[in-house]
């Protein structure tokens, strides 16, 4: 039985910031959109009631029994992990598996659990980008851009309200293309309409055809923002019936996707690059393919299990592909075209905790948040 110890730090946390769990998760769901996650994933709120009050959070890579015990001792009532505790359906809660025991202990102690997994991987400033920063890469871009997550919005706005509606759309999140925002295209034209006897038109008279100088405005948005953007459009637009069209786009989403590619400040011999990875990631069991004999300048990388991106890394012309969980036969695929480096799953994703903490502090600077001190890496090296 684990007993809760009410610490002075927890008391300070309560004095600084208490909020509803739904306020916290609503922000994270927006900052790390759940729509970005892969179909097999289960990111988001795993345990907790929306109206539950939270006062301090602990960030970890994995939720384990020791991490839950640590949270109880530190009086943290929210755990935020990279890897979800629950991937598949739980059919019973008897304590026979480690997942069941963790769930039981967390629920019993009113500890909420939130996870940000592949949606955090997809972010332009996500797990792989953090790896790239840690080893000092420049000119960082996405290795495997995501697709089918963009919509084009076309709407028609009277000239008198164009700026108001445009600003409302941009504030709702529309108009972002890569590192650019407030992106749109406008062209003037003439719109016509006739309202029936039940209408109350903003311009013109009911029952009569009316022509109005309007601006056709086009912009783009991510699919997960559709409801928010349309709500902003309808609220800012003066017409009773707002005319708009939404089109699904097949464009790659610049800035969203798996992995990164970047350039080292100075080329390194392959063994020196391996020493850099050993030092930065504290990677004690690096596996790598046969050296190519080339200097390392262009680096492709993907935090966690990224072997599926080997061919894409080769096609970028990268000298090295740094990732984890590479299978034996995958090492044959390179044919000496690229150096494959497996630095470990835990090692390549452990900096995800820093991303989560920075996001939280940015929005809630007075909310108490700490890193778990428990090493959750299940792999040991002899």
Which positions does each model-derived feature cover?
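Short, low-complexity, charge-dense intrinsically disordered segments
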Residues: 1-16
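Hydrophobic structural segments
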Residues: 15-382
């Amino acid at each position: 039985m684990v007993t809760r110890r009410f610490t002075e730090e927890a008391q300070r946390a309560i004095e600084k910031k208490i909020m509803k769990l739904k306020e916290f998760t609503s922000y994270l769901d927006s900052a790390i959109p759940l729509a970005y996650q892969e179909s097999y994933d289960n990111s988001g709120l795993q345990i907790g009631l929306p109206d539950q009050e939270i006062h301090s959070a602990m960030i970890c890579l994995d939720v384990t029994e020791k991490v839950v015990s640590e949270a109880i001792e530190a009086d943290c009532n929210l755990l935020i992990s990279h890897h979800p505790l629950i991937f598949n359906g739980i059919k019973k809660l008897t304590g026979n598996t480690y997942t069941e025991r963790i769930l039981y202990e967390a629920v019993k102690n009113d500890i909420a659990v939130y996870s940000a997994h592949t949606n955090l991987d997809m972010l332009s400033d996500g797990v792989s980008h953090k790896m790239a920063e840690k080893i000092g890469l420049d000119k960082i871009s996405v290795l495997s851009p995501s697709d089918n997550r963009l919509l084009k919005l076309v709407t028609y706005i009277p000239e008198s309200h164009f700026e108001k509606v445009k600003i409302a759309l941009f504030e709702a999140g529309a108009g972002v293309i890569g590192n650019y925002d407030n992106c749109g295209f406008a062209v003037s034209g003439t719109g016509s309409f006739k309202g029936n006897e039940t209408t109350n038109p903003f311009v013109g008279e009911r029952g009569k055809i009316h022509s109005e100088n309007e601006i056709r405005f086009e912009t783009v948005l991510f699919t997960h923002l559709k409801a928010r953007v349309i709500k902003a459009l309808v609220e800012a637009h003066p017409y009773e019936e707002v005319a708009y069209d939404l089109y699904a786009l097949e464009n790659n989403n610049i800035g969203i996707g798996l992995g990164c590619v970047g350039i080292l400040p100075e080329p390194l011999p392959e063994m020196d690059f391996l020493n850099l990875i050993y030092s930065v990631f504290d990677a004690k069991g690096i596996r790598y393919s046969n050296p190519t004999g080339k200097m390392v300048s262009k680096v492709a990388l993907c935090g966690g299990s990224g072997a599926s991106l080997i061919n894409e890394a080769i096609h970028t012309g990268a000298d090295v592909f740094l990732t984890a969980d590479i299978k034996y036969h995958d090492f044959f695929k390179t044919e000496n075209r690229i150096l494959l480096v497996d630095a470990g799953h835990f090692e390549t994703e452990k900096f995800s905790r820093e991303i989560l903490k920075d996001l939280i502090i940015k929005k809630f600077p007075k909310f108490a948040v700490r890193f778990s001190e428990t090493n959750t890496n299940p792999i040991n090296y002899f």
